[in-house]
């Protein structure tokens, strides 16, 4: 989800943090049965909803302090989206949790009167580790699933967004059961200390390098993991499409949050003629969405810090700059930038960009685009603009990605009834809606035959 450099924090672990005691306390709560009743789960979710609605402005203020995130964007992605997830979960939770009996025909080999089915049980005590790019949503939407499933939860917000982390650490104890939900702030030492403990599930959103660290720690206790990672999400633009419409949708999806979105379009594959028109239309679309001067626009964000600014800035030399390219380190500002005639071996194509830079790579057509995509790690998302049903069928059948979107990038993650997650290097496991509850649950087989 964020760039594969772990924070270079050398600070000692907080002397007040006793991870073993913390996890032990939460385990005791879970063992006592407190988190299992449906009423407790619904009450916690309702309280979490109140946290969002009563502190909407505080959340937006913290996100602006940390990320210069525009208020409208903060409301949409970090308040309204989690509230919709909570509402969807509350509306369906009792139905999701109800035991699922097998049809009698499935029990033909068993004694008469036998019944069987499945039911969900909570896993126990879980750890959720969030990144900095959507520091509220990516911490608290997984929490919705963990609470819905009836677990005790340790939350670890990102230290790279300190104002948001501090706000969450202050508000969670005011709204949620402090014997069942705890927030631990801090950097690498605190996270390392937390990972040394035994959990019943670990949910991590971030980069693959740290994902491997999380998975190694989990292996010590045979703890299952969900890894929501990232990668270079490609866009294929077919010949003959409405390029102006494509440009508008790409500009919105790519440059919101200054490109710091795990499923943002990373690069474009298209033929040279379409590439030339697309670059011009993207300039028009960017000016329409973010004004001719995005630096002074209230709708355009900033890079999270100088380290990530330096990393993204180093990618600006690839290809030919069609427009953009301006930057200001003191303001951690990089303009929306489109690069054309980019070669596959250039720096901008070697890593997830995670910034407002969109390279366009020329391909001859669909066959070459599919080969290009399949020659690289499986992405978190793949986007296609085409009018051809055959092209859509071939993309679905001949490529692998966490999700595929035809015509509307990013939209799939807003649909609660769709699983959100990666495959291969882009992650494992999924969540949102019912899938969140299932991620934090064990689906247990139950069979019964009366003795009389």
PLM feature spans:
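N-terminal Rossmann-like NAD(P)+-binding subdomain of aldehyde/semialdehyde dehydrogenases
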Residues: 1-115
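Conserved C-terminal structural/oligomerization subdomain of aldehyde/semialdehyde dehydrogenase
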Residues: 2, 37, 333-452
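ALDH superfamily catalytic-core signature
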Residues: 10-12, 209-343, 406
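Residues at or immediately preceding the N-termini of alpha-helices
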Residues: 19, 38, 56, 243, ...
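Short, well-ordered beta-strand elements within core beta-sheets of diverse protein domains
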Residues: 28-34, 128, 235-237, 267-270, ...
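Structural signal for hydrophobic packing residues in well-ordered secondary-structure cores
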Residues: 30, 34, 49-52, 56, ...
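Residue-level signal for inorganic ion chemistry
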Residues: 41, 86, 150, 181, ...
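Rossmann-like NAD(P) dinucleotide-binding subdomain of oxidoreductase/dehydrogenase enzymes
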Residues: 105-245, 276, 363
